[in-house]
UniProtKB/Swiss-Prot annotation:
DNA-binding region: 1809-1858
Catalytic residues, chain numbering: D868 (protease)
Residues binding Zn(2+), per UniProt: H1598, H1602, C1626, C1629
Residue ranges of the region described as Disordered: 115-208, 323-376, 446-469, 1859-1880
Keywords: Aspartyl protease, DNA integration, DNA recombination, DNA-binding, DNA-directed DNA polymerase, Endonuclease, Hydrolase, Lipoprotein, Magnesium, Metal-binding, Multifunctional enzyme, Myristate, Nuclease, Nucleotidyltransferase, Protease, RNA-binding, RNA-directed DNA polymerase, Transferase, Viral genome integration, Viral matrix protein, Viral nucleoprotein, Virion, Virus entry into host cell, Zinc, Zinc-finger
Gene: pol
Protein name: Gag-Pro-Pol polyprotein
The keyword Nuclease is assigned to this record: yes
GO BP terms: DNA integration; DNA recombination; establishment of integrated proviral latency; proteolysis; symbiont entry into host cell; viral genome integration into host DNA; viral translational frameshifting
Zn finger region (Integrase-type): 1589-1630
Binding site for Mg(2+) 1: D1109, D1184, D1185
Residues bearing a lipid moiety (N-myristoyl glycine): G2
Compositionally biased tracts (Polar residues): 117-132, 193-206, 323-334
Length: 1880
C-alpha cells in the first residue's frame, strides 16, 4: 500500500484477505485483488496514510468511489470494483470477530506500519479517532477503534487538488508529520467491525443537525431506480466457519440473505446501508450509521428477507465463483415453507476456464459441489386464471396484469413454468412474441455473464433448451440463474404490445388548461410506448414534446431547466406538479431548482398570501407555511431571522413594510389609498400579472440590489438610452435573447432589458422598426405608462412560418411624449411593475338568467334569435318566415330535445348581415311551432364568436401568454383576421443608439427562399379564369381564405394570370389546383437534380438510422420575391357581382415545372451544414424524405438534433408522427432493418390481368423490384411474350401456363428476398452468373466476422429484356454486364469492384480480350482481380453453367479438306447454292435478297449436316450473322429473319462437324476458283427453270390487295372460274360484290371535267374519321384524305391535296353542306377559277357517283385492314393510301384499263360509233356524229357542228353501218335523209 512496500508483504496481505473470503465460500484471484487495490490507491490517495481499515475508513473509500463515479462516469471504473468493495465491507461489518479475521487484521496491521513508514525514519505519530472527528464534520458515527500507530510520509498531491469537488465531501487535508503530536503507537486489529465499535466506549450517539440532514438525504436515496445495478450477484449465504476454526468461534444467529440496495443511485454503491447478517447485542455506546438505522429498518429487513432477488434491467453477473453452504431448517429469518414448495439442492456451474496462474490452481482445489438450497413453488391454477382474466380484460401490459405477474417472482419460476404461463394466459400472437423476446433476452444475459469462458451448456439453461427442458432439472438451477430467468420472463412480458392501436399522433397530444402535468405526461408516454416500443417513453424526442405541448403555465416553469441534462422526466413532473407551480416559478426567477429554493438561503422568502389555495389543492397533512423552515444551527440563520421588505411599501410608498401590513390611508402624495381586492370583483388582471399566482408571492433577495438583470451589470432605465442624433425622436429597443418566431408561437412577448419609470409627466409610444415588415416581423404598437416600473416588453408576430431573431436585433422604438391628465379619476393609485397600458379593463357579456339574443338581417329582413352553441344549423320559426320565400323538403332529421322528420329548408342561400357590416351566407331550416329563432354554429362560426370562460387558472395562463381581453383569440394580431399592412420606409435608419453600444447592434435577419427562376419572355401571360359552379365557387373562396390565413398567398395586382379549378377528393373535401401549363411554357426548365432514387443498400452496415419526413414541403419553401407575380390567379365571382379578388403564391405552387427542383435545392441547402459538420454520417435526401445513419445511436441522436435545428432555421416543418427511430424503417418504398433491405413483400394477383395495359403495368412493377430479387431474365420470358401482338392497350391478353409458372417463381423470389447493406471495410465482388437466356450479375460481399460462413448479396444486376441488336453473343452480353456493374458500383458505392468473377478460364479470357472489342472496353483501366472461382454459397448455386458460353463448332478460319460451297439469292425469289461446281436453284417464299440467300444457307446446312464445309457468300450481313448463332442465347423477334435464324441455330447446335463462313465481293471479275464459284451461283439465280404458277401469283396478289375476280383474270391470264374461286376463298371479301355500274349521272367527257366531292364518316379512324372523297366522273379516279372535321378549312385542305395529285378540275359538284356553301370555300374556288355547283338540297341522287365511291372505299378499307402489309386502323393515311392504290391502279374494267389509265391516257385506238340522229325540235336528221356514251335507252351524241354533246333517246338514233333510218322517220327531202354511205 505504501511506496516502499515489498512484494512479499503485499502477497502476505492479499493471501490473508483471500483466506478470509474463502471462509465465506467466495473465491477470488490474487491479481484481481491487486488490481482492485491499485485502483483504490489511484482514487483515494489518502488511503495508505490512514493506517487502519475499519468500517469508517472503508466508508470514506466508498464515498470517494461514489464521487469518482459521478464525476468521471461509469466507463472509467472497472466493472468489478464495487463487487470487491461490498465483499470487503461485509467482512469488516459482519464477520470480523472470527479468529481468521483477527489474524488477518494483525498481518494487515504490520504491513500498513511498514508500508507507511516515511524515508526519514522519524518516530511514528498516533492520531486517534476522536482527534480526527474533531477536525472534520462527521459524515457518520465516529469510530471508537483507536488507529494503528503509523508514520505518515510526504503527500505531494492533496485530495482537493486532484478532486476539487470532493474537498467538501470528505475529510480535510491530512496534516504533515511535523505538525502532529508524537504519541506511542497503539496496536489494534487492522479490520474492525461494528461489534468492536459498539464496545469502544464512546457515548456520543447523537448526530448534529447537518449530519442528520445528510443522513436523511441518503436514506431518501436508498432505493433510487434511476441507476441500474451493475451486478447480479445473489445474496451472500449465511456464514459457516471452516472446520479448523469452528471450535474457536461461538455459534451466531444468521439472518436470511437480503439484497443490498444502493443508497446514492450508483450501481453497487459502497455506501449502501448494510443490513447486518449477525445478531448484534444492544449497543451501549455511540455506533455508526448502520447501527443507528437498525431500529428504523428492522421492519424493512423482515420484508426484504422474503423478497426474491429480481435484478433490474441491464444486469451483469459478478465474475467471482461463489459456493454456498447448506442452510439449516431453523435459520433465523427464513420463512416457513409453502405448501406448494419443496427444497431442491442447487448445482453450481463449473468454471470451464483453465487457470493461468498458481493462484488459480490453488483455488481450483476448493470443493465445488452444490451445498446450498432454495425453495421452488409450483404454479397455482387459480393464479393463472387470475392472470388470464386480467389479460383478457385489461391487456397483457396493463399495470394490474404486470403486478400479478411480478407477484410470481417469489416462486422461482423455471423456464418451463414461464412457457406454461405464456401459453395459458396469452393469445396466440402474444405467446409467439413473448417466446421471441424471452429467447433474445436470454441470449443477452448469457453474453453479459460471460466474463470467463462459460461452460458449454451455460447459454442453454436460461431459455430452458435441451438438455434442460425437463422441469426437474430446471428446478435445480442455482439462485443466480433463476434470478436471471425471472428477469428475462418479466422483461419479455413487459415488452408485449400494449392494448390499443398505435395510431395516435404524438404531436396532437397536448396538455389541457386545467389538466395536471403528470396526467399529460402519462398520456404522452403511453402513446410513445405504443409508437416506438417499450422503453422509448424517456427518449429525447418525447422529452421535447413534454415541453412543447405543455400548457403555457407549465412551459414557463420548465423553460429555465430545459438545457439541463435530465435522465428522466421526473424533475419536469416536480417542476409542474399542481401543488408546486408557485415554487417552480419562484425558482425559475432565480435560476434555481425547487429543492434549492426550500433550502435555508439568504436570497428568497416565500410568503403565502392566500392560504385557501392550500386548503383546496394540498393534502390534508400539509399545513400552509408562513415562511421557509430554517435550521437553528445553519450559518445563514442570522440573515433569515430579520427577513423583511427591502423596498418601500408599494401601497403608501412611505415605509419599509409589507403591503399586506400597511395601515396607512394616504400615500406619500397625500392621496387616499383605494382598497384593493383579491380578484373577487373588479377588473381582470393584465397580461403580465404574476404577483399572486397560486397564492405565492416571490419577494426579491436581500439586499435587493438588481434582481431582474441576469448579470451583475446595473439596471438600465429608459433615461439611460442614447439618441442617435440630436434630432432623433425615438429611442431604439433591442432584444436581449436569441428568439425563433413562428406563426404557432406568435404573438410573442420579448423583454428588451430596459426598465421604467419614464421621466415625470411623460408617457411612451412603442412603434415598430420600419425595416421589419419586409422581413415578415410585425411589432404591435403599445403605450408605456409613466408609472410603469417593470421591464419593457414588446409584442411580436410574424406572417412567415419561421423567423430567427438574433440577440441584439433592433426591433422597436419608443417615442417619449408629454402626458396630459384629464381628471383625477383612476382605478389604481400605483402601477409598479404590472402590465403597462389599460389592458386590464375589458368588456364581456356575462351569462345570466336572460337569454343571449342577437338581431341579424337575412336578405335584408330583420330577425331576432337566440345564440345556440349546441345547434349545428340555424333554425327559423315558421311564424317568422316570409311566405314568399321558397322552401324545399329535405330527406334528413333534426334532433334536439324533440325530433323533426323531413323538415323544410330554405331553397336558396340567404345572406346574413349584422349591425357592424359583417356578412355571410347560410341555408337555414324552417320548423313550425318553434317559439324563437335559433342561431346555430353555422352562422356563429362565420361571425367568429369566441366562448370565454373567466377561470382563474385559464385566465392566468392566457394572460401570461400576452392575451389581451376583449380582442379575441386570433392567430394574427390578437383577433384581427387580416394582418396590418405596414409600409416600410427604407430611408429611415432609426435612432441608432446601437452604434454607441458595441454589444447591441442591428443584424439583418436572412430570410431563406427558393432560387430565382429564369424566364424565356418578359411579356405577361394572361389566361382568363373560367366560371365555376356555385358550390365550387364557395369552396374556392374558403380554400383561398385558408391559404391566405396560412401565409401561403398574398393579394396582388400582377399582370399574370392563370385559372384555378376545384376538385373533390374521395373524402369529400375540396382541393384547390391551378392550371400552370401556360406559365410552364415560358419558364426555363431547371432539369432534374436526382435522376434516380437513392439505393438503401449503400447505407453502411450496422449503422443506426433515423427517418425524417417533412410536412407540406412545398408550402414551407418561400418563392423568390421576384417570381411571385408570375403565379397569380383570380377567384371568380358569380354574375360578376364584384371584381375578382386576385392573389399570388408566396410558396412553391403545386403544378409548377420547377417546383421539385427548387424543393430539392432548398432542402439540400438546409442540411448542408449537417453534412459538413458530420462527415462520418451517411445522409440520404430525396424530395421531402431524409434518412440519416451514424455508427452509434448517440451520434445518430446528436446528428438528428442538429439536422432538426438546421431544417427549422430554414422554416421547414417536421412531421413528428412520421419520424422513425426504430426498426423497421420505411423509406422510399423499402423496409430497412439493421443490416438488411426488403422491398414490399407483396403477392402478385392475377385476377385483374386481362388487357395489354394490365400486363405492362405488372412487368413495370417487377422491373422495379428486380435489383433486390434473385430473379433471372429467363423467368420473365413467358410474361414478356404476352406483350407481343396487337399494340392496342385494351387488346385482350391471357396468362399462358408458362406465364403462370413465371409468376410463381416471382412470388417465391419476393418472399425469399435477402439483400444486405454494404460494409465499406470488406471487399466488393462482382459475380457474373451464366444463367439461361441472358447472364445475371450480383454485387457480393463475404462474411466479415467468419470467412468460412456464407456471404451476402448486395444488389442484383440484369440486362434489358429487349437488346439493341438482333444477334448478341453470350460473351458480348457478359461484357455489357461488366460495364453495367462497374458503372453501378461507381454510381451507388463510389468505387469499382475489388474483383470480378467470370465463367471463363484464363485462356478463354485472353482470347476474348484479343478478339472482342466489347471485352477490351469492359475491362479497360480495371485494376482489380479477375477470377473464375465462385463462392460456395447456396444463394448463387442456382446459376448453373449454360450452353451458350463459348463457340465450339464455328471456326474463324477455313477448314482444310472441307467441302467448298457458294450461295447467292435474288430478289426474284430464286435461291442458289453451288456444291462441287454443281449449281442448284430453289424457289423461296421470300422476295428480299438477304432472306433468299439466308434460305439458301439453310438448305446447305440441311444437305451437309454430316460433313464439314467452307461456305462463301457475297452478303456481308450473312457472313457476320451466321457465325454468331452458336453463342447467341436468344434472337430478337423484331425482324423477318428471326424464323430463319432460329432454324439455323438449331441446326448448328445439333451439328458435330465444324463449318466456316467467309465473305466474297461479287461482280469484280477477278480470276480464281472462288470468284468463278460465286459467279456460277449468281448466274444460277438468273435462270428460271421452274415454270411459275399463275394461280399462285394471283392468290398472292389477292392476299395483298384483295383484287376482284375480273381484274385477276385479266392480269394473270387465268379463267373466270379460277379467279372467282380465289375471291371466294378469301374470308374478307364479299362474294356477291356488285359490279360497278357507270350510272346515268352526268359525267365529264374528258379528264378533270367534272368532279363529284362529298364527306363520309369512317369511325375506326378515330379523330380523323371524316374522310373527304373526290371522284373524277370521266375516269372514275378516286381521291380521299382523312380530316378532323367537315369545316371549310378541311374541305380546302382536301382540294389542295387533289390538285397536287391529278390537276385542276373545270367543275366541282357537291351537296349543300355548310363546308361547301361557306364563304371561305366559295372564295377559294373563285380565286382558282373553278366552277362550283351544288345539287338539289336533300336529294343525294345527284351525287350518285361519289356516293357509290363511299361504299366502295369503305369495303376496301375493311378488307385491307388485315393485309400482310401490316397497316392498321391506327394508321389512317397509310391504310387509305393502300385502298386508293388498289382501286385506282389495280382494278381493271372490261377493256383491261384501270382508272389511272383512263385518267392519264384518255385517247385510245378504238373509234367511236358514228350514228345519224334526228333533232326532236326540227325532226331533221343530222350526222353522222360519234357516240360518246351509251346509256340505258339513251346515248350522248357529239354534235360536231355545234361542238358540244347532246343527249338523245335511243329511238332517234340510227347506225349508219349498213343501216338506215326507219321509213316513217325519213325526212321529206330525200337529199337530207340518212342512208347508206355512197347511196344516192
Amino acid at each position: 500500500m505504501g511506496q516502499a512496500s515489498s512484494h512479499s508483504e503485499n502477497d502476505l496481505f492479499i493471501s490473508h484477505l483471500k483466506e478470509s473470503l474463502k471462509v465465506r465460500r467466495i473465491r477470488v484471484r490474487k491479481k484481481d485483488l491487486v488490481s482492485f487495490f491499485s485502483f483504490i490507491f489511484k482514487t483515494c490517495p489518502w488511503f495508505p496514510q490512514e493506517g487502519s481499515i475499519d468500517s469508517r475508513v472503508w466508508g470514506r473509500v466508498g464515498d470517494c468511489l461514489n464521487d469518482y463515479y459521478r464525476v468521471f462516469g461509469p466507463e472509467t471504473i472497472p466493472i468489478t470494483t464495487f463487487n470487491y468493495y461490498n465483499l470487503i465491507r461485509d467482512v469488516l461489518t459482519n464477520q470480523s470477530d472470527s479468529p481468521d479475521i483477527q489474524r488477518l487484521c494483525k498481518e494487515g496491521h504490520k504491513i500498513l506500519i511498514s508500508h507507511s513508514r516515511p524515508p526519514s525514519r522519524q518516530a511514528p505519530v498516533t492520531i486517534t479517532t476522536s482527534e480526527k472527528a474533531s477536525s472534520r464534520p462527521p459524515s457518520r458515527a465516529p469510530s471508537t477503534c483507536p488507529s494503528v500507530a503509523i508514520d505518515i510520509g510526504s503527500h505531494d498531491t492533496g485530495q482537493s487538488s486532484l478532486y476539487p469537488n470532493l474537498a467538501t465531501l470528505t475529510d480535510p487535508p491530512i496534516q504533515s508529520p511535523h505538525s502532529r503530536a508524537h504519541t506511542p503507537p497503539q496496536h489494534l486489529p487492522l479490520l474492525a467491525n461494528s461489534k468492536t465499535l459498539h464496545n469502544s466506549g464512546s457515548q456520543d450517539d447523537q448526530l448534529n443537525p447537518a449530519d442528520q440532514a445528510d443522513l436523511e438525504e441518503a436514506a431518501a436515496q436508498y432505493n433510487n431506480p434511476d441507476w441500474p445495478q451493475l451486478t447480479n450477484t445473489p445474496a451472500l449465504p449465511p456464514f459457516r466457519p471452516p472446520s479448523y476454526v469452528s471450535t474457536a468461534v461461538p455459534p451466531v444467529a444468521v439472518a436470511a440473505p437480503v439484497l443490498h440496495a444502493p443508497t446514492s443511485g450508483v450501481p453497487g454503491s459502497p455506501t449502501a446501508p448494510n443490513l447486518p447478517g449477525v445478531a448484534l447485542a444492544k449497543p451501549s455506546g455511540p455506533i455508526d450509521e448502520t447501527v443507528s438505522l437498525l431500529d428504523g429498518v428492522k421492519t424493512l429487513v423482515t420484508k426484504l428477507s422474503d423478497l426474491a432477488l429480481l435484478p433490474p434491467a441491464g444486469v451483469m453477473a459478478f465474475p467471482v465463483t461463489r459456493s454456498q453452504g447448506q442452510v439449516s431448517s431453523n435459520t433465523t429469518g427464513r420463512a416457513s415453507p409453502h405448501p406448494d414448495t419443496h427444497t431442491i439442492p442447487e448445482e453450481e456451474e463449473a468454471d470451464s476456464g483453465e487457470s493461468d496462474s498458481e493462484d488459480d490452481e490453488e483455488e481450483s482445489s476448493e470443493p465445488t459441489e452444490p451445498t446450498y438450497t432454495h425453495s421452488y413453488k409450483r404454479l397455482n391454477l387459480k393464479t393463472i386464471e387470475k392472470i388470464k382474466t386480467a389479460v383478457a380484460n385489461y391487456g397483457p401490459t396493463a399495470p394490474f396484469t404486470v403486478a400479478l405477474v411480478e407477484s410470481l417472482s417469489e416462486r422461482w419460476l423455471t423456464p418451463s413454468d414461464w412457457f406454461f404461463l405464456s401459453r395459458a394466459a396469452l393469445s396466440g400472437g402474444d405467446n409467439i412474441l413473448w417466446k421471441s423476446e424471452y429467447e433474445d433476452i436470454s441470449k443477452q444475459f448469457a453474453e453479459r455473464t460471460r466474463v470467463r469462458p462459460p461452460p458449454k451448456d451455460g447459454p442453454l439453461k436460461i431459455p430452458g433448451a435441451s438438455p434442460y427442458q425437463n422441469n426437474d432439472k430446471q428446478a435445480q438451477f442455482p439462485p443466480g440463474l433463476l434470478t436471471q430467468i425471472q428477469s428475462a420472463g418479466l422483461k419479455a412480458w413487459k415488452r408485449l404490445p400494449q392494448k390499443g392501436a398505435a395510431t395516435t399522433s404524438l404531436a396532437k397530444i397536448r396538455q389541457g388548461p386545467d389538466e395536471s402535468y403528470s396526467d399529460f405526461v402519462s398520456r404522452l408516454q403511453e402513446t410513445a410506448d405504443r409508437l416506438f416500443g417499450s422503453g422509448e417513453s424517456e427518449s429525447s424526442f418525447v422529452k421535447h414534446l413534454a415541453y412543447e405541448n405543455a400548457n403555457p403555465a407549465c412551459q414557463s416553469a420548465i423553460r429555465p431547466f430545459r438545457q439541463k441534462e435530465l435522465s428522466t422526466m421526473s424533475p419536469l413532473l416536480w417542476y409542474c406538479s399542481a401543488h408546486a407551480v408557485g415554487l417552480a416559478i419562484g425558482a425559475a426567477l432565480q435560476n434555481l431548482a425547487p429543492a434549492q429554493l426550500l433550502e435555508p438561503r439568504p436570497a428568497f422568502a416565500i410568503i403565502v398570501t392566500n392560504p385557501a389555495i392550500f386548503q383546496e389543492t394540498a393534502p390534508k397533512k400539509i399545513q400552509p407555511p408562513t415562511q421557509l423552515p430554517t435550521q437553528p444551527n445553519a450559518p445563514q440563520a442570522s440573515l433569515i431571522k430579520n427577513l423583511g421588505p427591502t423596498t418601500k411599501c408599494p401601497r403608501c410608498k412611505k415605509g419599509f413594510h409589507w403591503a399586506s401590513e400597511c395601515r396607512s390611508r394616504l400615500d406619500i402624495n397625500g392621496q387616499p389609498i383605494i382598497k384593493q381586492g383579491n380578484l373577487e370583483q373588479g377588473p381582470a388582471p393584465g397580461p403580465h400579472y404574476r404577483d399572486e399566482l397560486r397564492g405565492f408571492t416571490v419577494h426579491p433577495p436581500i439586499p435587493p440590489a438588481n434582481p431582474c438583470p441576469p448579470s451583475n451589470q446595473p439596471r438600465r432605465y429608459v433615461t439611460d438610452l442614447w439618441r442617435a442624433t440630436a434630432g432623433s425622436a425615438g429611442l431604439d429597443l433591442c432584444t436581449t435573447t436569441d428568439t425563433i418566431l413562428t406563426t404557432q408561437n406568435s404573438p410573442l412577448t420579448l423583454p428588451v432589458g430596459i426598465y421604467g419609470p419614464l421621466p415625470p409627466q411623460t408617457f411612451g409610444l412603442i412603434l415598430a422598426e420600419p425595416a421589419l415588415p419586409s422581413k415578415g416581423i410585425q411589432v404591435l404598437p403599445g403605450i408605456l405608462d409613466n408609472d410603469f416600473e417593470g421591464e419593457i416588453h414588446i409584442i411580436l408576430s410574424t406572417t412567415k412560418d419561421l423567423v430567427t431573431i438574433p440577440k441584439g436585433t433592433r426591433l422597436a422604438q419608443i417615442v417619449i411624449l408629454p402626458l396630459q391628465q384629464i381628471n383625477s379619476n383612476f382605478h389604481k393609485p400605483y402601477r409598479g411593475a404590472s402590465a403597462p397600458g389599460s389592458s386590464d379593463v375589458y368588456w364581456v357579456q356575462q351569462i345570466s338568467q336572460q337569454r343571449p339574443t342577437l338581431k341579424l338581417k337575412l336578405n335584408g329582413k330583420l330577425f331576432s334569435g337566440i345564440l345556440d352553441t349546441g345547434a349545428d344549423a340555424t333554425v327559423i320559426s315558421y311564424t317568422h318566415w316570409p311566405r314568399n320565400w321558397p322552401l324545399t323538403t329535405v330527406a334528413t332529421h333534426l334532433r334536439g330535445i324533440g325530433q323533426a322528420t323531413n323538415p323544410q329548408q330554405s331553397a336558396q342561400m340567404l345572406k346574413w348581415e349584422d349591425s357592424e357590416g359583417n356578412n355571410g351566407h347560410i341555408t337555414p331550416y324552417v320548423l313550425p311551432n318553434l317559439p324563437v329563432n335559433l342561431w346555430g354554429r353555422d352562422i356563429l362560426s362565420q361571425m367568429k364568436l369566441v366562448m370565454c370562460s373567466p377561470n382563474d387558472t385559464v385566465m392566468t395562463q392566457m394572460l401570461s401568454q400576452g392575451y389581451l381581453p376583449g380582442q379575441g383569440l386570433g392567430k394574427n394580431n390578437q383577433g384581427i383576421t387580416q394582418p396590418i399592412t405596414i409600409t416600410p420606409k427604407k430611408d429611415k435608419t432609426g435612432l441608432g443608439f446601437h452604434q454607441n453600444l458595441p454589444r447591441s447592434r442591428a443584424i439583418d435577419i436572412p430570410v431563406p427562399h427558393a432560387d430565382k427562376i429564369s424566364w424565356k419572355i418578359t411579356d405577361p401571360v394572361w389566361v382568363d379564369q373560367w366560371p365555376l359552379t356555385y358550390e365550387k365557387t364557395l369552396a374556392a373562396i374558403a380554400l383561398v381564405q385558408e391559404q391566405l390565413a396560412a401565409g401561403h398567398i398574398e393579394p396582388t395586382n400582377s399582370p399574370w394570370n392563370t385559372p384555378i379549378f376545384i376538385i373533390k377528393k374521395k373524402s369529400g373535401s375540396w382541393r384547390l389546383l391551378q392550371d400552370l401549363r401556360a406559365v410552364n411554357k415560358v419558364m426555363v426548365p431547371m432539369g432534374a437534380l436526382q435522376p434516380g432514387l437513392p439505393s438503401p443498400v449503400a447505407i453502411p452496415l450496422n449503422y443506426h438510422k433515423i427517418v425524417i419526413d417533412l410536412k407540406d414541403c412545398f408550402f414551407t419553401i418561400p418563392l423568390h420575391p421576384e417570381d411571385r407575380p408570375y403565379f397569380a390567379f383570380s377567384v371568380p365571382q358569380i354574375n360578376f357581382q364584384s371584381p375578382m379578388p386576385r392573389y399570388q403564391w408566396k410558396v412553391l405552387p403545386q403544378g409548377m415545372a420547377n417546383s421539385p427542383t427548387l424543393c430539392q435545392k432548398f432542402v439540400a441547402a438546409a442540411i448542408a451544414p449537417v453534412r459538413s459538420q458530420w462527415p462520418e454520417a451517411y445522409i440520404l435526401h430525396y424530395m421531402d424524405d431524409i434518412l440519416l445513419a451514424c455508427d452509434s445511436a448517440e451520434a445518430a441522436k446528436a446528428c438528428y438534433a442538429h439536422i432538426i435545428s438546421c431544417l427549422t432555421s430554414y422554416g421547414l416543418k417536421i412531421a413528428p408522427d412520421k419520424v422513425q427511430v426504430s426498426e423497421p424503417f420505411s423509406y422510399l418504398g423499402f423496409e430497412l432493418h439493421h443490416q438488411q433491405v426488403f422491398t414490399p413483400r407483396v403477392c402478385l394477383k392475377t385476377d385483374h390481368l386481362k388487357t395489354l395495359n394490365d400486363f405492362q403495368k405488372l412487368l413495370g412493377d417487377i422491373q422495379w423490384l428486380r435489383p433486390y430479387l434473385k430473379l433471372p431474365t429467363s423467368a420473365l420470358v413467358p410474361l414478356n411474350n404476352i406483350l407481343k401482338g396487337d399494340p392496342n392497350p385494351l387488346s385482350v391478353r391471357a396468362l399462358t401456363p408458362e406465364a403462370k409458372q413465371s409468376l410463381a417463381l416471382i412470388n417465391k423470389a419476393i418472399q425469399n428476398q435477402s439483400v444486405q447493406q454494404i460494409s465499406y471495410n470488406l471487399p466488393l465482388v462482382l459475380l457474373l452468373l451464366p444463367t439461361p437466356h441472358t447472364p445475371t450479375a450480383v454485387f457480393w460481399q463475404p462474411n466479415g466476422t467468419d470467412p468460412t460462413k456464407n456471404g451476402s448479396p448486395l444488389l442484383w444486376l440484369h440486362l434489358p429484356a429487349s437488346p439493341s441488336k438482333v444477334l448478341l453473343t453470350y460473351p458480348s452480353l457478359l461484357a455489357m454486364l461488366i460495364i453495367k456493374g462497374r458503372y453501378t458500383g461507381r454510381q451507388l458505392f463510389g468505387r469499382d469492384p475489388h474483383s470480378i468473377i467470370i465463367p471463363y478460364t484464363q485462356d478463354q479470357l485472353t482470347w476474348l480480350l484479343q478478339t472482342s472489342d466489347e471485352w477490351a472496353i469492359a475491362l479497360s483501366s480495371f485494376t482489380g482481380d479477375i477470377d473464375n472461382h465462385y463462392p460456395s454459397d447456396p444463394v448463387i448455386q442456382f446459376a448453373k453453367l449454360h450452353q451458350f458460353i463459348f463457340p465450339k463448332i464455328t471456326k474463324c478460319a477455313p477448314i482444310p479438306q472441307a467441302t467448298l460451297v457458294f450461295t447467292d439469292g435474288s430478289s426474284n425469289g430464286i435461291a442458289a447454292y453451288v456444291i462441287d461446281n454443281q449449281p442448284i436453284s430453289i424457289k423461296s417464299p421470300y422476295l428480299s435478297a438477304q432472306l433468299v440467300e439466308l434460305y439458301a444457307i439453310l438448305q446447305v446446312f440441311t444437305v451437309l449436316a454430316h460433313q464439314p464445309f467452307n461456305l462463301y457468300t457475297d452478303s456481308a450481313y450473312i457472313a457476320q450473322s451466321v457465325p454468331l448463332l452458336e453463342t447467341v442465347p436468344f434472337i430478337k423477334s423484331s425482324t423477318n429473319a428471326t424464323p430463319l435464324f432460329s432454324k439455323l441455330q438449331q441446326l448448328i447446335l445439333n451439328r458435330q462437324h465444324p463449318f466456316f463462313i467467309g465473305h466474297l465481293r461479287a461482280h469484280l471479275n477477278l480470276p480464281g476458283p472462288l470468284a468463278e464459284g460465286n459467279a456460277l451461283a449468281d448466274a444460277a439465280t438468273q435462270i428460271f427453270p421452274i415454270i411459275s404458277d399463275p394461280i399462285h401469283e394471283a392468290t398472292q396478289a389477292h392476299t395483298l390487295h384483295h383484287l376482284n375476280a375480273h381484274t385477276l383474270r385479266l392480269l394473270y391470264k387465268i379463267t373466270r372460274e379460277q379467279a372467282r374461286d380465289i375471291v371466294k376463298a378469301c374470308k374478307q371479301c364479299v362474294v356477291a360484290t356488285p359490279v360497278p355500274h357507270l350510272g346515268v349521272n352526268p359525267r365529264g367527257l374528258v379528264p378533270n371535267a367534272i368532279w363529284q366531292m362529298d364527306v363520309t364518316h369512317f369511325t375506326p379512324f378515330g379523330k380523323q374519321r371524316f374522310v373527304h372523297v373526290t371522284v373524277d366522273t370521266f375516269s372514275g379516279f378516286i381521291l380521299a384524305t382523312p380530316q378532323t372535321g367537315e369545316a371549310s378549312k378541311n374541305v380546302i385542305s382536301h382540294v389542295i391535296h387533289c390538285l397536287a395529285t391529278i390537276g385542276k378540275p373545270h367543275t366541282i359538284k357537291t351537296d349543300n353542306g355548310p363546308g361547301y356553301t361557306g364563304k371561305n370555300f366559295q372564295d377559294f374556288c373563285q380565286k382558282l377559277q373553278i366552277k362550283h355547283v351544288t345539287g338539289i338540297p336533300y336529294n343525294p341522287q345527284g351525287q350518285g357517283v361519289v356516293e357509290r365511291a363511299h361504299q366502295t372505299l369503305k369495303n376496301a378499307l375493311n378488307r385491307l385492314a388485315r393485309s400482310p402489309l401490316g397497316f392498321s386502323m391506327q394508321q389512317p393515311r397509310n391504310l387509305l393510301s393502300h385502298a386508293l392504290f388498289q382501286l385506282n391502279f389495280l382494278q381493271l374494267d372490261s377493256q383491261g384499263r384501270s382508272a389511272a389509265d383512263r385518267l392519264w391516257h384518255p385517247q385510245t385506238s378504238q373509234q367511236h360509233a358514228t350514228v345519224m340522229w334526228r333533232d326532236p325540235l326540227t325532226s331533221v336528221w343530222k350526222g353522222p356524229d360519234p357516240v360518246l356514251i351509251w346509256g340505258r335507252g339513251s346515248a350522248c351524241i357529239y354534235d360536231q357542228k355545234e361542238d358540244g354533246p347532246r343527249w338523245l333517246p335511243e329511238r332517234l338514233i340510227r347506225h349508219i353501218n349498213n343501216q338506215t333510218a326507219p321509213l316513217c322517220d325519213r325526212p321529206s327531202n330525200p337529199n337530207t335523209a340518212p342512208g347508206p354511205k355512197g347511196s344516192p
